[in-house]
């Protein structure tokens, strides 16, 4: 289970206004659920565009300083400047503990890294089991860490002494200094210069997906270049045979969703189509229906990505409930990524082990709150317009693929 990003808070970004909105305790699969136009894609957009390969270490260098996409003019919340856009990253206390212990061992001053000193230092910064590290999005800059943003006027002597001990771990040849000017800010800076706040590549899968023609570059996850990429892992060179494992894994998933143990993908030499061997027939993938076409694309994108953060817009499009559940099971069990998903599917809310966040629009601003209890998830369903009476009080039920199909049923 890979968890690269543990928590994120945003201020003045898109639909999120000056009231800071936070989501924390991320897991492998994280769901942002809400009705249309509630702003549920704001977190995904920020992760994909602004946190791609983020590293605190790169803030002070010319290498890696620029995010994937600079803030656009319409990214700041209405009436606010780009400089007002802030983001906070959640850093678990245990990661800070690890950094301090490793540094003490390296500098042979482990006696300073007593459990009590480490506890007092981190508790002074922490909100529960984590520390929020705040940055400005434009220009990219460090702003503050933890509770020091509260401008506390009094600090207990034992905290001051513990902080000095931690400072001496990072600055073994230094003496003197003060708590406010040296020991605390320099200790925080040294912790953040470690790898504890470095994120991998982030990938964005849009809601509109379509397998592109041959010869296109596989540069994004819209479907362009997918045929050529699958052909590459179907028959890799002798030095890259390990890539075929991914192709076999996608085939196993195809067999799971079709219920046919013989189902197999094939990319022909002309690369005009993705073909499927199934039930002693050879068919283009598109002939199996939009749902199978869609879910195989998603599985391929997420299998090809390795140890990355993947943001997916509305994966439920064209998928009936069983396929939605199978997709979530596949992502959790067979891939190595962390997922952030914007959805309005009630089916996905019940994904085992997923962190769910309820996104709604209140007084014109996007609000985000956790939904971990049955009552909180019920409120999501109510907000989405789901009602038990929609099914219970119906005389009969006819399933259709979309609203446009209703025109065929007017005389039924």
Walk through the language-model features, giving the residues of each:
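Generic amphipathic alpha-helical segments used as scaffolds and interaction surfaces in large
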Residues: 192, 237-241, 339
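Switch/communication elements of ASCE P-loop NTPase nucleotide-binding domains
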Residues: 1-59, 249-391, 395-397, 406-411
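P-loop NTPase switch/coupling surface
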Residues: 1-216, 245-246, 252-268
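Alpha-helical coupling/stalk and coiled-coil linker elements that connect catalytic or binding modules
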Residues: 231-252
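Short, glycine-/Ser/Thr-/acidic-enriched flexible segments
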Residues: 210, 404-405
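Short, histidine-centered active-site or binding-site loop motifs used for metal coordination
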Residues: 209, 230-234, 278-280
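A solvent-exposed, charged loop/short amphipathic helix patch at secondary-structure junctions
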Residues: 219-236
């Amino acid at each position: 289970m890979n968890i690269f990003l543990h928590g994120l808070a945003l201020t003045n970004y898109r639909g999120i206004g000056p009231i800071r909105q936070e989501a924390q305790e991320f897991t492998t699969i994280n769901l942002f659920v809400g009705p249309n136009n509630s702003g549920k894609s704001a977190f995904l957009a920020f992760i994909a565009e602004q946190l791609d390969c983020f590293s605190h270490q790169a803030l002070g260098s010319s290498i890696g300083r620029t995010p994937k996409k600079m803030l656009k003019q319409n990214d700041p919340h209405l009436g606010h400047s780009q400089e007002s856009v802030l983001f906070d990253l959640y850093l678990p206390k245990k990661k800070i503990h690890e950094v301090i212990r490793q540094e003490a061992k390296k500098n042979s001053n482990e006696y300073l890294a007593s459990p009590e000193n480490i506890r007092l230092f981190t508790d002074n910064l922490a909100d529960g089991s984590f520390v929020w590290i705040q940055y400005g999005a434009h220009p990219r800059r460090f702003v503050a860490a933890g509770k020091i943003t509260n401008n506390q006027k009094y600090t207990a002597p034992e905290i001051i002494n513990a902080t000095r001990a931690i400072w001496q771990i990072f600055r073994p040849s230094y003496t003197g200094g003060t708590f406010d000017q040296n020991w605390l800010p320099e200790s925080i800076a040294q912790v953040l210069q470690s790898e504890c706040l470095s994120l991998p590549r982030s990938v964005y899968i849009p809601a509109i997906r379509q397998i592109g023609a041959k010869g296109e570059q596989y540069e994004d996850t819209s479907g362009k270049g997918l045929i050529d990429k699958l052909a590459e892992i179907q028959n890799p060179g002798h030095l890259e045979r390990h890539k075929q494992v991914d192709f076999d894994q996608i085939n196993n998933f195809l067999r799971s969703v079709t219920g046919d143990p013989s189902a197999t993908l094939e990319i022909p030499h002309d690369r005009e189509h993705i073909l499927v061997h199934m039930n002693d027939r050879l068919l283009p993938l598109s002939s199996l229906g939009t749902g199978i076409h869609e879910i195989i694309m998603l599985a391929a994108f997420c299998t090809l990505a390795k140890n990355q953060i993947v943001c997916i817009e509305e994966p439920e499009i064209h998928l009936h409930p069983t396929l939605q559940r199978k997709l979530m099971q596949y992502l959790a069990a067979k891939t190595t990524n962390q997922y952030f998903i914007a959805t309005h599917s009630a089916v996905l809310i019940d994904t085992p082990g997923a962190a769910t966040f309820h996104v709604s629009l209140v007084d014109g601003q996007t609000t985000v709150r956790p939904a971990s209890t049955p009552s909180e998830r019920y409120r999501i369903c109510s907000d989405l317009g789901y009602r038990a009476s929609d099914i219970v009080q119906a005389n009969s039920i006819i399933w259709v693929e979309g609203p446009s199909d209703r025109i065929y049923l007017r005389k039924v």
